[in-house]
């Protein structure tokens, strides 16, 4: 008799995805982040669901309802801290996952990569609307500044911004619809993640060498289930340390004050995971130019497969590309730092040079490095 997990219609899918899946034998810890992102999503959906049971999406009571969750609801403080810091862990894993994809050439699985970029955009949208919900000062002003960017679109901009707001400014209608979006988007993310996996399993995983691994594969379970479990332990340790010992470390002190449309905070800035994009947005004095640069900074990921010029897939044996990759990493960290600084010298000039280097590296230097490495590998005799 056939094993049930191989014959049952539902168990068969799970078996082919997580148990008997043929996996390259040499994938490193950099391949752990996919499963960690899945765990992050589950944590966020569960904590978010329980928070939504006690939250009210009304401008008069939203701030109080969050305080009520932290003070009066059983373990409400823990749910809130896990949810807020879980978002940070989510983005940390996301950035490392995307970085891994760029370094090892995983973007050559174009469908998987493109759905991944759409996933990244959807998660960013979810985090943005979620940040507005506590209705603190930075929630309100962050929403005002970012939604206002829509008004930079020629001709239809102002109408579009007012349509999103549901009025002439960020108000009750905006908060209510943002809560609706924040509730539905994680389920869309879950569906997209399944499609992401579906396309990944069509081709199989890439591996650090970038060479076709078909000749040497092992079953996912128990080898990689145990490896993912170790990664999960580290993730949970980091999340619990953050949520239990310094839950407000990554938050903004302005969010302890209820939203006040008559009082603007001295420095409006988003959460740390958006600072790199915010720095690129601020680096261009023109409003529309800034918005386009902001979009380009993320959407540029979609054209990375077209910019691959090297004969080798992975950067493992390409030292020049490796150097440029780590310069790009340092550049993104610099952008994150600049995004959190006030608009004054020397931050202005650094904030203008860093985005230029960002686009130069991806669009020009890295493709040229690939061509140069091809040339260097050709026999010269």
Curated annotation (Swiss-Prot):
Places the protein is found: Mitochondrion inner membrane
CDD domains registered for this protein in UniProt: cytochrome_b_C, Cytochrome_b_N
Residues given in the record as heme b b566 binding sites: 97, 196
Topology in membrane: Multi-pass membrane protein
Swiss-Prot/TrEMBL cofactor(s): heme b
Keyword annotations of the record: Electron transport, Heme, Iron, Membrane, Metal-binding, Mitochondrion, Mitochondrion inner membrane, Respiratory chain, Transmembrane, Transmembrane helix, Transport, Ubiquinone
Residues bound to heme b b562: 83, 182
TM stretches of this protein: 33-53, 77-98, 113-133, 178-198, 226-246, 288-308, 320-340, 347-367
One term under GO cellular component: respiratory chain complex III
InterPro entries found in the cross-reference section: Cyt_b/b6_C, Cyt_b/b6_C_sf, Cyt_b/b6_N, Cytb/b6-like_sf, Cytochrome_b, Cytochrome_b_C_euk/bac, Cytochrome_b_N_euk/bac, Di-haem_cyt_TM
Example of a GO MF term: metal ion binding
Binding residue positions for a ubiquinone: 201
Misc note: Heme 1 (or BL or b562) is low-potential and absorbs at about 562 nm, and heme 2 (or BH or b566) is high-potential and absorbs at about 566 nm.
Name this polypeptide is given: Cytochrome b
Organism: Parantechinus apicalis
Lineage summary: Eukaryota, Metazoa, Chordata, Craniata, Vertebrata
